[in-house]
Amino acid sequence: MKFGLTLLRVIVGVLFFGHGTQKLYGWFGGHGIEGTAGFFESIGLKPGRKHATAAGAAETGGGALLALGFLTPAAAASLIGVMSTAIRKVHAKNGPWAGDGGYEYNLALIAIMVTLADLGPGHVSLDHALGIEVKGPLVALLALAAGIGGATVLTEAGSQDTEPAPAPTDTPEPAEAAATV
């Protein structure tokens, strides 16, 4: 069990780290911050650059923390946030199956994050070496709630219409017009 938990945590953490660097720097065949920002704008996350930076940082930082087994519940929450946003903004409309562009892969990653927050990172981790023993069902539920809640707040803020307010006109207000008659 301990070996399997460590293997799962490290592999998933490294993969998230790689995805984050694709978004931020264009590494590993990614589109970099500008390409990611354009995609985010196209799905209604505006300003795209800020959302791309946040997603890339969450994946890079969360993936690194997860791979190291350091602050595991916080890492899980950040990665749950990214995956719940991906489900909400891209995959939910396609149903569950990945072959149809659905959310099954993202949901599986969320389940892994919840499981790691519940069980902890294992003995081969910085959390264990430093005596950080924050884990269990309540921690897992808090990581899930924080990830989904934080992502919802950010996506709602990013979905708001950001058009500038109309410029003032020289046309008098109705009350002013009535007073001059």
Segments predicted by a language model, with ranges:
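Extended, low-polarity transmembrane helix blocks
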Residues: M1-W27, T72-V181
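Solvent-exposed, well-ordered loop and adjacent helix/strand elements within mature globular domains
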Residues: L15, T21-A55
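Alpha-helix C-terminal capping segments
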Residues: L68-F70
